[in-house]
Amino acid sequence: MSRVYNFSAGPAAIPEEVLFTVRDELLDWHGIGMSIAEVSHRGEEFIGVAEEAERDLRELLAVPESYHILFLQGGSRLQFAMVPMNLLANHKKAVYIDSGVWSNLAIREAKNYCDPHLATNAKELNYTGIPDQATWDMPNEAAYFYYVDNETVNGIEFPFIPDTDLTLVCDMSSNLLSRPFDVSRYGLIFACAQKNMGLAGLTIVIVHDDLLKRSPLPTTPSYLQYALHAKERSFINTPPTFAWYLAGLIFKWVKNQGGVAVLAERNQRKAAKLYKFIDKSNFFDNPINPTYRSRMNVIFRLADEILNSLFLKEATENGLANLKGHRLLGGMRASIYNAMTEEGVDALINFMGQFEKRHG
């Protein structure tokens, strides 16, 4: 069997050890004569899987007991609506940062429910960084403060937690479990699973109990109410059981790697060596302010964009898959989430060096 290095932005690479476990358990999970994909979501087998996954995630992120962890259907984009629906309460205003494609989409969705107030807009920097926090326009009152921790398309990542007294809401879809952080600084965190936690179709929400007491907007469907999901422990209806099971396996894998702090060091090394190569090159370029460069999604361009197709073709032939940049930006993008090995990054750097020698 020959596997490639998969640099896809999502669905993304899954640790091989996890895939081997899935393969071994797929037909007969723990000797019950069935796949975990076939069991009842209310049976003791899956309830055990679900509870263990939640315990492991709570341990990995040091989530306080004053927070609920929800395992919900749908992608992060659904949260663009669920957040204002559930958290606005009597407020007319919510604060947002426009840092790139995904925050911009969240702002557009929020306009259906409130008046999004822009604290700052990275567009003025051509989305190559975040304006200095001292320049942000921060109101004294608002329902919440929303930002995207890592912009997968633009290749921007926050190196700090914004300083605010407002309820902090964060989209961590592409970097949850990639570095330690203080959960207690946040009111609500959400992340889709297909970057660092497995399969598309599952989104994890970590929400403080106090926010569950806010009254949703009157038009909010019951199925989109956080409080109801919390009350039913994410079992209002049949949850995405296989995605939940796989996320649990990945949580075990993270623990076996030594935890989130160990992965953070590895992620920093991977990103640093790739950026170092790009910065030394006259053939490849990354436009992002080094302070805000993403550790998860490294975007780069070739000096001669006519060579883009050839670069992608030869990369694929050399076992380096899914390096094409997002359709909105073009160029290249190497997504190096937790599951990407250092060997994979080294292989990419080696190929880029050889390609530059041939065509630079």
UniProtKB/Swiss-Prot annotation:
<dbReference type="InterPro" id="IPR000192">
    <property type="entry name" value="Aminotrans_V_dom"/>
</dbReference>
<feature type="binding site">
    <location>
        <position position="42"/>
    </location>
    <ligand>
        <name>L-glutamate</name>
    </ligand>
</feature>
<dbReference type="GO" id="GO:0005737">
    <property type="term" value="C:cytoplasm"/>
</dbReference>
<keyword id="KW-0718">Serine biosynthesis</keyword>
<keyword id="KW-0664">Pyridoxine biosynthesis</keyword>
<comment type="pathway">
    <text>Amino-acid biosynthesis; L-serine biosynthesis; L-serine from 3-phospho-D-glycerate: step 2/3.</text>
</comment>
<feature type="binding site">
    <location>
        <position position="102"/>
    </location>
    <ligand>
        <name>pyridoxal 5'-phosphate</name>
    </ligand>
</feature>
<feature type="binding site">
    <location>
        <position position="152"/>
    </location>
    <ligand>
        <name>pyridoxal 5'-phosphate</name>
    </ligand>
</feature>
<feature type="modified residue" description="N6-(pyridoxal phosphate)lysine">
    <location>
        <position position="195"/>
    </location>
</feature>
<dbReference type="GO" id="GO:0008615">
    <property type="term" value="P:pyridoxine biosynthetic process"/>
</dbReference>
<comment type="function">
    <text>Catalyzes the reversible conversion of 3-phosphohydroxypyruvate to phosphoserine and of 3-hydroxy-2-oxo-4-phosphonooxybutanoate to phosphohydroxythreonine.</text>
</comment>
<comment type="subunit">
    <text>Homodimer.</text>
</comment>
<dbReference type="GO" id="GO:0030170">
    <property type="term" value="F:pyridoxal phosphate binding"/>
</dbReference>
<keyword id="KW-0032">Aminotransferase</keyword>
<dbReference type="InterPro" id="IPR022278">
    <property type="entry name" value="Pser_aminoTfrase"/>
</dbReference>
<dbReference type="InterPro" id="IPR015424">
    <property type="entry name" value="PyrdxlP-dep_Trfase"/>
</dbReference>
<keyword id="KW-0963">Cytoplasm</keyword>
<dbReference type="GO" id="GO:0004648">
    <property type="term" value="F:O-phospho-L-serine:2-oxoglutarate aminotransferase activity"/>
</dbReference>
<protein>
    <recommendedName>
        <fullName>Phosphoserine aminotransferase</fullName>
        <ecNumber>2.6.1.52</ecNumber>
    </recommendedName>
</protein>
<keyword id="KW-0028">Amino-acid biosynthesis</keyword>
<dbReference type="InterPro" id="IPR020578">
    <property type="entry name" value="Aminotrans_V_PyrdxlP_BS"/>
</dbReference>
<dbReference type="Pfam" id="PF00266">
    <property type="entry name" value="Aminotran_5"/>
</dbReference>
<comment type="similarity">
    <text>Belongs to the class-V pyridoxal-phosphate-dependent aminotransferase family. SerC subfamily.</text>
</comment>
<keyword id="KW-0808">Transferase</keyword>
<feature type="binding site">
    <location>
        <begin position="237"/>
        <end position="238"/>
    </location>
    <ligand>
        <name>pyridoxal 5'-phosphate</name>
    </ligand>
</feature>
<dbReference type="InterPro" id="IPR015422">
    <property type="entry name" value="PyrdxlP-dep_Trfase_small"/>
</dbReference>
<dbReference type="GO" id="GO:0006564">
    <property type="term" value="P:L-serine biosynthetic process"/>
</dbReference>
<keyword id="KW-0663">Pyridoxal phosphate</keyword>
<feature type="binding site">
    <location>
        <position position="171"/>
    </location>
    <ligand>
        <name>pyridoxal 5'-phosphate</name>
    </ligand>
</feature>
<comment type="pathway">
    <text>Cofactor biosynthesis; pyridoxine 5'-phosphate biosynthesis; pyridoxine 5'-phosphate from D-erythrose 4-phosphate: step 3/5.</text>
</comment>
<feature type="binding site">
    <location>
        <position position="194"/>
    </location>
    <ligand>
        <name>pyridoxal 5'-phosphate</name>
    </ligand>
</feature>
<dbReference type="InterPro" id="IPR015421">
    <property type="entry name" value="PyrdxlP-dep_Trfase_major"/>
</dbReference>
